[in-house]
A protein has these predicted regions:
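Charged, glycine-rich intrinsically disordered N-terminal tails and low-complexity linkers that flank
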Residues: 1-71, 75, 118-150
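Nucleic-acid nuclease catalytic cores
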Residues: 76-98, 104-192
């Protein structure tokens, strides 16, 4: 399946995702389960037959994901390779599409290209972007910045499920700015 779906957003990729809980949908389903009066049939239909909504922010993210991948490969990890949709063989109803994998290091890559990166530096995105502040925590220690993901955000769940599916213990979650062709890395460990 991973080879057949290497081109994310292909018809095969969409088909494989439509019949499974995915890394990107799991948090929405988990938090929905706490709803006092859930309409599961309606909720599941959102995943089986998703409406194709492509905002300018989503178009921007898709447009610059390849640039981000190449920048990461050049500056941080030349062993990273693309992969398609991968299912967890022990639990074939769940799967994920990490943006890359380094099988030698047991590491996956997840890329985010916030729209604010079109006109702003990576420093600005980290320190000022209200969208980024929802999922990124910045701690300063002895003048060094340390980044972590908010555990109560969909991106954290997405990364964790992708690591579980790929049987990897680590992830590099990158936030990319096309303005300066640069990124920051949030190193994420698998949370058993």
């Amino acid at each position: 399946i991973a080879v057949e779906t290497a081109t994310q957003n292909s018809k095969e990729w969409q088909l494989q995702r439509s019949v499974r809980i995915t890394a990107s949908s799991c948090y929405g389903l988990y938090t929905y389960s706490k709803n006092e009066s859930p309409d599961w049939e309606r909720k599941i239909q959102q995943y089986i037959k998703p409406k194709t909504l492509l905002t300018k922010e989503m178009r921007y993210g898709k447009q610059f994901e390849e640039n981000a991948f190449l920048c990461y490969s050049r500056k941080r990890n030349p062993l990273i390779q693309k992969t398609g949709f991968v299912i967890q063989y022990d639990e074939p109803w769940i799967g994920g599409s990490p943006d890359g994998i380094d099988t030698l290091s047991g590491l996956i890559l997840e890329i985010k290209c916030p729209f604010s990166g079109k006109e702003n530096s990576i420093e600005w995105i980290i320190e000022n972007c209200p969208v980024t502040k929802r999922y990124l925590k910045v701690q300063e220690l002895n003048g060094d910045k340390r980044f972590t993901l908010n555990k109560k955000h969909t991106y954290y769940a997405q990364v964790q499920v992708n690591m579980w599916v790929m049987k990897c213990a680590k992830a590099d979650f990158i936030i990319y700015s096309s303005k300066d062709d640069d990124f920051v890395v949030v190193e994420v460990d698998y949370d058993k």
